[in-house]
């Protein structure tokens, strides 16, 4: 008789990070330093608003001051850059989160060079991207890939020498999470839509990270017995329900651990964002 895999939720991980941050922020506030995050959002996309609500709540619970700059959808490139420069120069702001993707008429390839790298808490700047690739811990890796690694560490998954397969090669999750896992001494394989025998390659992994953005694509043929599965996907299924890239019910009898969607990786991401704001604040104040 097979035993069902353990569903590993993000909340205990997020709570532990938050507890540590509350102590750190208390010490900073006692010295007259108030960590502050500014969110720069164009328009009002529902997924942006959903993440924003979670981020504001998390930061406020920790004691981080927050501000949201909601910009018109028809904002020009020049106007957007002016706003970003103003926030860069504001000494009271320690962290900046720019919601992406930006509308098509705004050129991210230009704008990403404008954000101050020392305030760039979700890895928009090429300088922080380069630090991720180099394994340089002084920068700010993207929050979601960092959340993936934090979850694995929290649940004592031994990454050293483990075969880890990442499904997806985006700069948002796939590539950066692969680099972060390499820094943890995992043996990493990156798969994508052109990978031959995709399920066969995935089924060799001790740890499988699904970040392809296709609802319930990963079934039991993708996982080996006892694998750990981290589901980064956020999709909507035919019934209109939120679901991940993994068909959890199909794989639950084979895996040892799996993150749910919702209540998995996403719930840790906002804690990482807060952690990066506090780190930025300390660096800017030589703490």
Curated annotation (Swiss-Prot):
InterPro entries (UniProt xref): Aminoacid_DH-like_N_sf, NAD(P)-bd_dom_sf, THF_DH/CycHdrlase, THF_DH/CycHdrlase_cat_dom, THF_DH/CycHdrlase_NAD-bd_dom
EC identifiers of the protein: 1.5.1.5, 3.5.4.9
MF (Gene Ontology): methenyltetrahydrofolate cyclohydrolase activity; methylenetetrahydrofolate dehydrogenase (NADP+) activity
Binding of NADP(+), residues: 168-170, 193, 234
Recorded catalytic activity of this chain's protein: (6R)-5,10-methylene-5,6,7,8-tetrahydrofolate + NADP(+) = (6R)-5,10-methenyltetrahydrofolate + NADPH; (6R)-5,10-methenyltetrahydrofolate + H2O = (6R)-10-formyltetrahydrofolate + H(+)
Subunit text: Homodimer.
Described function: Catalyzes the oxidation of 5,10-methylenetetrahydrofolate to 5,10-methenyltetrahydrofolate and then the hydrolysis of 5,10-methenyltetrahydrofolate to 10-formyltetrahydrofolate.
HAMAP family documented for this protein: THF_DHG_CYH
Protein name: Bifunctional protein FolD
Organism: Clostridioides difficile (strain 630)
